[in-house]
A protein has these predicted regions:
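Nucleotide-activated chemistry modules centered on ATP-dependent adenylation/adenylyltransferase
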Residues: 1-265, 270-272
């Protein structure tokens, strides 16, 4: 996470954590205890096809669907995973919990992003592990609007916390130039939009393979909260490209793009 920030990227720790920490460690524990499967409380599902294939599916509760965060799971793992609540609405799970006397779980605050660091301590945690480089906050025309204490505190499309007090805002982060942060007053600045998103470290959670250079039509998104948009996916090895039918806003290096076919989460890749 810190390494990605130091390279000027905005990482998604949850996706990487699920792949390399949570599930890998759970499978190790399962083997040690002689268990053949692991179960988690994610709102997602797995499906065993008639042809023997396994697919990762969206959770039934689409508002709480977490397949996005599971897009980097290995396809070979799906046969060993159980998602017992994936076929329920969250409201149904709460009712079950209350019925079993687990009221303390209902309404419990959900962890977001860096679950291992309190939101109030996030900046301190990062600054202790990085050597922040101060720089200027510049308008798209090159006008100096302020100073910052580290470009890692900013991301494409960001509006709040920009430390600009000229009274002319709001401003939006549209890019970086070395240690300088570039902002625009135009929420629809052209530099915020792109039809093409290039990917690295592509993972196919529900596709055992895809012919190199072949293209398929998918629905995709470049962040969890974004609505799915039509796109053409082309994969070559671990690299990929999404060509969206309509421009998508705030394409951010280090974030995860995830692609779907119907309710099947095909996989994802890191935006480069």
């Amino acid at each position: 996470f810190i390494g990605e920030l130091s390279l000027g990227r905005t990482p998604n720790p949850c996706v990487i954590c699920n792949r390399f920490l949570k599930f890998e460690q759970m499978f190790k524990f399962a083997r040690d205890f002689g268990c053949s499967k692991v179960a988690t409380g994610h709102y997602a599902r797995v499906r065993h096809g008639k042809d023997g294939s396994w697919s990762l599916l969206k959770g039934r509760d689409r508002a709480k669907d977490q397949s996005y965060y599971l897009s980097f799971l290995k396809n070979s793992w799906l046969s060993k995973i159980l998602f017992p609540i994936g076929g329920f609405e969250k409201s149904e799970i709460y009712k079950m919990a209350q019925k079993e006397g687990l009221d303390f779980l209902v309404g419990k605050k959900q962890s977001q992003d860096l679950c291992f660091v309190d939101d109030k301590l996030r900046r301190t945690f990062i600054d202790k592990r990085l050597r922040p480089q101060s720089g200027k906050i510049l308008s798209v025309d090159g006008e100096a609007l302020g100073q910052h204490e580290g470009s890692h505190n900013y991301t494409i499309g960001q509006r709040k916390g920009l430390d600009i007090s000229d009274g002319q805002g709001p401003y939006f982060v549209v890019g970086f130039d070395g240690d300088d942060v570039i902002v625009s007053r135009d929420e629809k600045d052209p530099s915020l939009y792109s039809n093409v998103v290039n990917l690295r470290n592509v993972n196919l959670a529900s596709l055992a393979d895809l012919d190199s250079g072949a293209s398929i039509s998918v629905m995709a998104k470049i962040r969890y909260q974004q609505k799915l948009s039509r796109a053409k996916l082309t994969i070559s090895g671990k690299s990929g490209k999404l060509e969206f039918s309509s421009p998508v806003r705030a394409v951010t290096k280090g974030q995860i793009a995830v692609f779907y076919k119907g309710e099947v989460c095909l996989g994802g890749g890191i935006i480069k």
